[in-house]
C-alpha cells in the first residue's frame, strides 16, 4: 500500500480494476476484499487528508489519543464482521458505560435497576423494579411503549420518567425538534433494561476498542500490494456521470466503482440538498487525571451540549495529570460549509429525494453506492462493515 497526498502526474484510472471513493469502513473493506480475493488493483480516493473516515483517531498536543469526529465504540453481534476486523487489530476488553446527568445526578443508561433507585429512592425504586421483573423477566430490554401498553400505573410512571428525563430534552437538542415533531415510533423504542448490568451494550458478545486505535486498524486493512491510497483528492473533480457511463479524467471508466460519499454532492445538489445534522465538537485538555467516571455522560435535562466524552476512560491510556474531554453541540448541517454531515434526517420527503438521486445512477452497472453517506442512512460501524462485505461478495460473484 502507498498513501499519497494528491494524485501523481499522469494518474491513469484505467490502470486500476476498481476505484473506491472514500477510505472509511465501507471503502476500506471493499478495497481489501477485492484486492486479496480476486487480485483487483484498487485505487482509493479520499477527500480528507487522512484515512479511516469518521473513525479517525490521533494523538493531541497533550499526548492523548482522541477520536477526531466523536466517540466510536466497537460492538457487534455479527461474528463474520468481528472475525474480519480482528485480522487487522487486537481488541481491548473495554465495556462501554454511559451515564445520564439528570438534574445533577448521574444515572446509568439504558435505565436499569440502579437508575430506578437513584430516580425514585431505594424503596420506591425497588418496588418498581420488582414490578418490571414480574412483568417482563430479568436481563431484558423493554421499550417504554411496551410499558405503556400494560395499562399499569407503576409501569407508566417509569415510562413517563424515562421519556421526560432521559429521552425528550436530549432528543430535542440532538435533532432540533420540538416534542410534537418527534416521531412517536422513535419515542416508543426508548428502552429500560430490567437488570443490574450497567453496560451500554449489555448483550453484545463482541465489544472493545482496537488496541492501537482505529487509524492503525485502517492502516493494516489497506496495507496490501494491490491497493494505492490517494488522500486530498475530491472525486467530484474527476468524475463525469451520464445515464450509462462514468468518465474519470475525461475517459470512460470500465472497472468497478465503489462510491461512499454523498450522492447529492456528486450531482452538485442539482435536485436539492439532502438534510443532515452535524456536530460542533469542543475539545478541552484539563490538568487532572480524570474528569468523569465513564467514557460518556449524556446531558439529558441541562446544558446546550448533548454529551461529554472523556477519551482516556475509553482507550485505557495512562497519562497522569492530563485528560482530554470533548463536548458535542448538535446543529443543522449547511452544505458547502466544510461541516461534516453526521446524521441523515430520515423524514419521508428526504428519503424520496435520496431515491431521486439514486435513480441517476441506477443504469450504471459498475457504480456501487455503499455506506452511511452514499445510502443516506445511519450505520453503526459493524453494520457498514457487513454491508461492505456483502457488496464485495456480489462483485466477486459477478467476476468469478
Kindly give the residue locations of the regions a language model identified:
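Mid-domain catalytic core of redox enzymes
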Residues: 37, 237-360
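N-terminal Rossmann-like FAD-binding beta1-loop-alpha1 element of flavoenzymes
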Residues: 16-44
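A short, basic/flexible loop-to-alpha-helix module at the beginning of a structural domain
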Residues: 1-14
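Short catalytic/ligand-binding loop motif for oxyanion handling, primarily in non-cytosolic enzymes
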Residues: 52-54, 102-103, 108-110, 175, ...
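Glycine-rich FAD pyrophosphate-binding loop
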Residues: 35-61
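C-terminal catalytic lobe of FAD-dependent flavoproteins
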Residues: 340-400
Amino acid at each position: 500500500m502507498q498513501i499519497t497526498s494528491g494524485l501523481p502526474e499522469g494518474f491513469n484510472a484505467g490502470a486500476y480494476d476498481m476505484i473506491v471513493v472514500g477510505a472509511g469502513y465501507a471503502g476500506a473493506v471493499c478495497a481489501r476484499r477485492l484486492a486479496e480475493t480476486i487480485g483487483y488493483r484498487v485505487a482509493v480516493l479520499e477527500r480528507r487528508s487522512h484515512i479511516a473516515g469518521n473513525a479517525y483517531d490521533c494523538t493531541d498536543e497533550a499526548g492523548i489519543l482522541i477520536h477526531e469526529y466523536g466517540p466510536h465504540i466497537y460492538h457487534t453481534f455479527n461474528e463474520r464482521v468481528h472475525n474480519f476486523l480482528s485480522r487487522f487489530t487486537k481488541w481491548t476488553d473495554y465495556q462501554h458505560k454511559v451515564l445520564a446527568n439528570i438534574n445533577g445526578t448521574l444515572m446509568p443508561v439504558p435505565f436499569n435497576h440502579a437508575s430506578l433507585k437513584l430516580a425514585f429512592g431505594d424503596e420506591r425504586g425497588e418496588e418498581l423494579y420488582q414490578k418490571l421483573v414480574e412483568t417482563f423477566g430479568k436481563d431484558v430490554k423493554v421499550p417504554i411503549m411496551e410499558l405503556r401498553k400494560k395499562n399499569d400505573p407503576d409501569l407508566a410512571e417509569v415510562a413517563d420518567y424515562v421519556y421526560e428525563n432521559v429521552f425528550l430534552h436530549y432528543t430535542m437538542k440532538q435533532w432540533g425538534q420540538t416534542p410534537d415533531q418527534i416521531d412517536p415510533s422513535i419515542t416508543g423504542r426508548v428502552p429500560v433494561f430490567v437488570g443490574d448490568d450497567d453496560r451500554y451494550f449489555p448483550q453484545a458478545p463482541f465489544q472493545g476498542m482496537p488496541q492501537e486505535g482505529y487509524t492503525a486498524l485502517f492502516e493494516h486493512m489497506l496495507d496490501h500490494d494491490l491497493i494505492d491510497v490517494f488522500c486530498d483528492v475530491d472525486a467530484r473533480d474527476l468524475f463525469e456521470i451520464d445515464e450509462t457511463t462514468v468518465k474519470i479524467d475525461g475517459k470512460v471508466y470500465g472497472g468497478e466503482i465503489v462510491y461512499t460519499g454523498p450522492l447529492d454532492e456528486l450531482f452538485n445538489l442539482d435536485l436539492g440538498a439532502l438534510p443532515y445534522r452535524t456536530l460542533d465538537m469542543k475539545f478541552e485538555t484539563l490538568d487532572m487525571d480524570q474528569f468523569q467516571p465513564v467514557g460518556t455522560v449524556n446531558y439529558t435535562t441541562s446544558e446546550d451540549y448533548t454529551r461529554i466524552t472523556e477519551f482516556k476512560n475509553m482507550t485505557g491510556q495512562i497519562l497522569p495529570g492530563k485528560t482530554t474531554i470533548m463536548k458535542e453541540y448538535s446543529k443543522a448541517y449547511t452544505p458547502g460549509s466544510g461541516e461534516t454531515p453526521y446524521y441523515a434526517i430520515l423524514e419521508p420527503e428526504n428519503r424520496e429525494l435520496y431515491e431521486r438521486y439514486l435513480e441517476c445512477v441506477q443504469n450504471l452497472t459498475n457504480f456501487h453506492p455503499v455506506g452511511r453517506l452514499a445510502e443516506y442512512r445511519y450505520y453503526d460501524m459493524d453494520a457498514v462493515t457487513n454491508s461492505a462485505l456483502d457488496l464485495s461478495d456480489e462483485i466477486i460473484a459477478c467476476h468469478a
